[in-house]
């Protein structure tokens, strides 16, 4: 049985909690894809991008306005340079935009777990220059969910932050399923090869970003989870500083299973059971 050090049930396992979602635009060889967390485009034109303040509990780490970049063949951008590099390398190997999205997303789940992860959900819009296809990969409520899920014993609504940080906010993830679906139709490189960048980073370690350090410092609830506390904070209880080498061999183990067995490895079997156990044994308010 694989042991899972999921950083945070409300962020890494499942993003069903009004967290900030990055709108993605991808283009490679005439194909545009709009999704979550990743941005690729073969740029002939770049429009203005507007952002809004993220809904709590994820704190803002501010934003910077910089001069845009242009490319004749393709370009890629993501919320973390390591994720961007992973997608870029896939494109250089002849991979499709969809291939690059998958590699980038797997790295984002490691280096930016507060905003992205295997347990999240996504919308994806695919445009090849002639037609548009939309894919719904958002989370769904657990089978046992009912209208009283977020009510207390007095039939009063639970406070938002209490609900979000509890096991009750966890839904059935959809991101991996939708990525598997679009890869089947539009992928070029083997599915297994797309997980190598994230597996290597999780095994060998990555440097904590300034954004992660800032958000860890602002998060008031992360230490409520012993596993998350051990992973994100040092022995004195302080968040890892920018530049700290952080490893996650458990995440690498999960990705290896998914790379070999597809999205079903997350939705059933030992990984799924580990998620269910985590949710149902959440310390303050267990979920379904």
Model-found features: residue ranges?
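Noncatalytic scaffold domains of N-terminal-nucleophile
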Residues: 50-85, 89, 97-261, 266-268, ...
